[in-house]
Amino acid sequence: MTDSKTVSVYTDGACPSNPSPTGGIGIYNPSTGIGIGYKVQDEDMTNNRAEMLAVIMALMSEDAESIEIFTDSEYVSKNLTENIQRWRSDGYKGIKNSDLWEILHDLTYGAINVRFVYVTFVRRGSHVGNKVADALASGAANTTDNYVWDYKKDIDSWINKDPTKRHKKASKPKPKAKPAPNNEAKTSFMPF
C-alpha cells in the first residue's frame, strides 16, 4: 500500500472443470481482514473469465481514491498492460472475453487510480493475501450453496447508476510503473 488513501486488494478466480458453467471469485482486503467469495455462472465460464470477474468485483466494491489489485493472473495483468488499448480502438473484434475486457477498460481508466500488481508464480506461496483470495474463489466455485452472483445485472446496475463510469478517459498521463515493495511481486500495469 502506498498511502492511507490507497486500498490494497487480492483477487482470484477459479473454474474447477475448466471450462464449465460454474466458477468462483475471491476478493480479500488485508487491511480490513474482510474476504468474500462468490459463485459465478456463465455458459462460457473459464478460469480466465473468473479471474476477470474477481477484478471487476473488487473495482466495483472498493470505495477509495486509489486501489492496488494484486492478481496471480498473467492473462489479466498482461492483457491490461499490453493489449487493451489496441483492442478497444479495434472495437474488441475477435477478442475472447471482449464483454469483460470492455468493462475492465472502463473501470481501470475511470475516475479512480488503479494499480495492478502481478503476483508471480514463484511468489504466490509467500503472499498470504493471494492464498486467502485463492481459498475464497475455490470455496465459492465448489460450494453447494444456491446463491450465485448475477454479475451481468450488478454490472449493468452499477453502470446505469453512474453513466460517467463508462468510457471515461484518463485525465492524467499514465506514469511509469513502480516496483512492488520488497520485490515480492512484479508491477504490470498502473493507469491513472
Language model regions located:
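RNase H-like nuclease fold core
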Residues: 1-49, 60-62, 135, 139-140, ...
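RNase H catalytic domain
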Residues: 11-20, 37, 57-136, 163
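Conserved phosphate-coordination/catalytic loops
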Residues: 45-50, 94-98
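Hydrophobic (often cysteine-bearing) scaffold residues that line and stabilize catalytic clefts
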Residues: 50-51, 129
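Short secondary-structure junctions and interdomain/linker hinges
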Residues: 111-115, 140-147
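Acidic two-metal-ion nuclease catalytic site recognized across multiple nuclease folds
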Residues: 142-192
